[in-house]
Amino acid sequence: MEISEKWIRHYSSTHKILLVGEGNFSFSLCLASAFGSAMNITATSLDSEDELSIKYMDAVDNINILKRYGCDIQHEVDVHTMSFDNSLSLQRYDRIVFNFPHAGSRFFGRELSSRAIESHKELVRGFLENAKEMLEEDGEIHITHKTTYPFSDWGIKKLGKGEGLKLLKKSKFELSHYPGYITKRGSGGRRSDDYFPVGECSTYMFTQS
């Protein structure tokens, strides 16, 4: 029996989806729950599995549910080098998604500094450089990011253009559109599991030029 296609916002159950920088894996689980399957989802974290279990109370439970849905879970995936990762490099994806990229806890409370902004931009630039090598011909790279100052100074659209990508669309992001998705600080300290408010933010959708 043919399984019907299911959608949640910009994502279809038929898309081959790569999620990077997952914290507690709640966004991955949101998509899997909406689709009723995660057979087409690869969800990755920079952290090791042990680090995740320390940082987030619900990460291990979320990962176990995702595995039952058929999700491919990968740990210690660096967005700066992921296009060379043996477990990912042979794949091509319809959607590559990085939600709320951040260069790390050393910049919490210092987002106004030029050093922080440049470090964040370098993270996004490295992600885009690798992600564009992993796209299907008509695939899209999605970055969800705060649009208020100082986050607006990252210049997401300009960073995409610098990597030879075209901004297809900029769509307002509403957390309520993704049931079960809980944004976490993920700083590596005692506040890793704390929720952070998303405020005004958008999803930037890039394609190959």
Curated annotation (Swiss-Prot):
GO terms for biological process: rRNA base methylation. It comes from Arabidopsis thaliana (Mouse-ear cress). This is Uncharacterized protein At4g26485. One of its GO terms (molecular function) is rRNA (uridine-N3-)-methyltransferase activity. It comes from the Eukaryota. Gene3D superfamilies: Vaccinia Virus protein VP39.
